């Protein structure tokens, strides 16, 4: 459980990641996006209305999300996250990150400090790339969550 969820927008878009697509029953569903190398906050969808219509046609339950179709990746994802949280009764505060020259783990530590965090929740793979000493020096405990032990239900199945 978290007190605050911070949506990262001031970081690099991850090609072939989950920021603009999802996998359901071994099939990928994608919101097409411009291919420029820009931060997430500057990424634009090519055809957001058309792509969202295709997804909601395949998964009518997603109509419950009451999503505001947005041209920017960060705004659209924020709309989906906030709507899903409301439907699921999740009342955790949702914030955006902020511009900083820091990168990688130093950025995460700075965000945690900004929110007076005592703990940082990470996926288990964070062990492979985070500099845990930076968290230790800031007196922030890192809690690794093994995704394999979490529910495998997708948002579509939960709705």
Walk through the language-model features, giving the residues of each:
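Residues lining hydrophobic/aromatic ligand-binding pockets adjacent to catalytic sites
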Residues: 1-159
